[in-house]
């Protein structure tokens, strides 16, 4: 028999509910209350037992219309998410309800969103590289299959476009499933993503789960777990390799901070919740490879005021296997994706995993770019003429490498007018190796801008030569 209680206090999204002594619900249980204003069921999640047979719960939708004394029913279980192939191509909210107006979801099962991480004995320890087809990532910050990758960057440097390109490449080139969690981002961006995925034909391999900026903090705080639960089903039951995108993990922390303050907890550093590390760990530890399949997670991380030492990005760092740093300076040069080749790293940039040739080319590229960076002060003060012949050559090659790290994206075709390019890792390594060896010293640097493979750069140089003549 489900326990029943009644509302005794409402403060914004926080609702206190009183139960009989023997019917007190567990922490994280979902409670249901019918909103008299619209007749819809509102889900509350129990967060605290505050004494006097009263629980403090956080609402996962607006509490407008609720009044004291309304009856609340304990469902006896946590929030559940629909899982299985029936959710592919659909848009859900935090409680698994469809928000795309395409009718009910034919779920194969319903799983609770609070689940333990896989046991250490179930996890897979071999490391495999996940090919993305994006040159700068595959060369300098390769993604491990089943790993966690962070996209760091301030506002407007291209995190979401990069995420969309990855979804497209994995769905079309590798026929993989993707789960996208829109955590506290703009509703317009979610709508754009859905429409663009329909155009690109990748929607049938993707599930979109949204808890957007306008929603209460409870929804934004839990939507990542709903998406992760859907991904876990594909991994554990269907044995698939799944890509989980979280845009934006900072908003997950921000929502947690709001919930924490509303629950009356004492804030910690910079006003964040005292449970920051635990909240992050509960989400991140479930993202891993098992013997059955893998979940590779790509997380866009907004860096507040471009300060990478802020507790939110700093806590996320400790969980990551690779970090892709997007730089405003590179975006200002018009080079997209605006990935910083010197700040972006990966734990698997190791000859034992990627092979000697790839490793040496990657380190060679970073060495040339670092030398160019060191020389920029001299160039700014004295000009190129004061450099040695060797340094002049390094500057020329570095500028070509910088431009060759750019790439036209499929999802940006309608903005740029350039056809998107998918570049295999072997072609990426070959191209940069040839630039480092000086095979293309005679080509103009603009030939390397916004092309795919090195052969395309050579063809572009021929065209430029022809048009100049």
From Swiss-Prot:
It is found in: Cell inner membrane. It is a peripheral membrane protein. PROSITE patterns: ATPASE_ALPHA_BETA. Its EC number is 7.1.2.2. InterPro entries: AAA+_ATPase, ATP-synt_VA_C, ATP_synth_F1_bsu, ATPase_a/bsu_AS, ATPase_alpha/beta_chains, ATPase_F1/V1/A1_a/bsu_N, ATPase_F1/V1/A1_a/bsu_N_sf, ATPase_F1/V1/A1_a/bsu_nucl-bd. Its main location: membrane. Gene3D superfamilies: 2.40.10.170, Bovine Mitochondrial F1-atpase, Atp Synthase Beta Chain, Chain D, domain 3, P-loop containing nucleotide triphosphate hydrolases. It catalyses: ATP + H2O + 4 H(+)(in) = ADP + phosphate + 5 H(+)(out). Keywords: ATP synthesis, ATP-binding, Cell inner membrane, Cell membrane, CF(1), Hydrogen ion transport, Ion transport, Membrane, Nucleotide-binding, Translocase, Transport. ATP binds at residues 153-160. GO terms for molecular function: ATP binding; ATP hydrolysis activity; proton-transporting ATP synthase activity, rotational mechanism. Transmembrane segments: none annotated. It is an enzyme of class 7 (translocase). SUPFAM superfamilies: C-terminal domain of alpha and beta subunits of F1 ATP synthase, N-terminal domain of alpha and beta subunits of F1 ATP synthase, P-loop containing nucleoside triphosphate hydrolases. NCBIfam families: atpD (TIGR01039). F-type ATPases have 2 components, CF(1) - the catalytic core - and CF(0) - the membrane proton channel. CF(1) has five subunits: alpha(3), beta(3), gamma(1), delta(1), epsilon(1). CF(0) has three main subunits: a(1), b(2) and c(9-12). The alpha and beta chains form an alternating ring which encloses part of the gamma chain. CF(1) is attached to CF(0) by a central stalk formed by the gamma and epsilon chains, while a peripheral stalk is formed by the delta and b chains. Produces ATP from ADP in the presence of a proton gradient across the membrane. The catalytic sites are hosted primarily by the beta subunits. HAMAP family: ATP_synth_beta_bact. Belongs to the ATPase alpha/beta chains family. This is ATP synthase subunit beta.
């Amino acid at each position: 028999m489900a326990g029943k209680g009644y509302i005794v206090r409402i403060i914004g999204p926080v609702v206190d509910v009183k139960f009989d002594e023997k019917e007190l619900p567990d922490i994280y249980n979902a409670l249901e209350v019918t909103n008299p204003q619209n007749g819809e069921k509102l889900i509350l999640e129990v967060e605290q037992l505050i004494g006097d047979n009263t629980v403090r719960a956080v609402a996962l939708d607006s509490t407008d219309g609720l009044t004291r004394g309304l009856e609340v029913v304990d469902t006896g279980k946590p929030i559940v998410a629909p899982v299985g192939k029936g959710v592919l191509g659909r848009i859900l909210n935090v409680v698994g309800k469809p928000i795309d107006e395409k009718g009910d979801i034919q779920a194969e099962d319903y799983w609770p969103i609070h689940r333990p991480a896989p046991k250490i004995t179930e996890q897979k320890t071999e490391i495999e590289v996940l090919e993305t087809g994006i040159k700068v990532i595959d060369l300098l910050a390769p993604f491990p299959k089943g790993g966690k990758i962070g996209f760091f960057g301030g506002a407007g440097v291209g995190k979401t476009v990069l995420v969309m390109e990855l979804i497209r490449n994995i769905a079309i080139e590798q026929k993989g499933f993707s789960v996208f969690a829109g955590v506290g981002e703009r509703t317009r961006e979610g709508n754009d993503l859905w429409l663009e995925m329909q155009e690109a034909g990748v929607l049938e391999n993707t599930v979109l789960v949204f808890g957007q900026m306008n929603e209460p903090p409870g929804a934004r705080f839990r939507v990542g777990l709903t998406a992760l639960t859907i991904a876990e089903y594909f991994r554990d039951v269907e044995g698939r390799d799944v890509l989980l995108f979280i845009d934006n993990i900072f908003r997950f922390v921000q929502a947690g901070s709001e919930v924490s303050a509303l629950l009356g907890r004492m804030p910690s550093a910079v006003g964040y919740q005292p449970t920051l590390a635990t909240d992050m760990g509960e989400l991140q530890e479930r993202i891993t490879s098992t013997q059955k399949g893998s979940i590779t997670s790509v997380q866009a991380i907004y860096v507040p005021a471009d300060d990478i030492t802020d507790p939110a990005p700093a806590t996320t760092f400790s969980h990551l296997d690779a970090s892709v740093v997007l730089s405003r300076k590179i975006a200002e040069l018009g080079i997209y994706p605006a990935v910083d080749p010197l700040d972006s790293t990966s734990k698997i940039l190791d000859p034992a995993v990627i092979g000697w040739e790839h490793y040496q080319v990657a380190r060679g590229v970073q060495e040339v770019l670092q030398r160019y960076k060191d020389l920029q002060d001299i160039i700014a003060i004295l000009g190129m003429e004061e450099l040695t012949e060797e340094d002049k050559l390094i500057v020329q090659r570095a500028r070509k490498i910088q431009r060759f790290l750019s790439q036209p994206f499929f999802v940006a075709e309608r903005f740029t007018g350039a056809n998107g390019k998918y570049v295999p890792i072997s072609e990426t390594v070959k191209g940069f190796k040839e630039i480092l060896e000086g095979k293309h010293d005679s080509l103009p640097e603009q030939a390397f801008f916004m092309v795919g493979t090195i052969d395309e750069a050579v063809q572009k140089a021929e065209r430029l030569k022809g048009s100049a003549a």
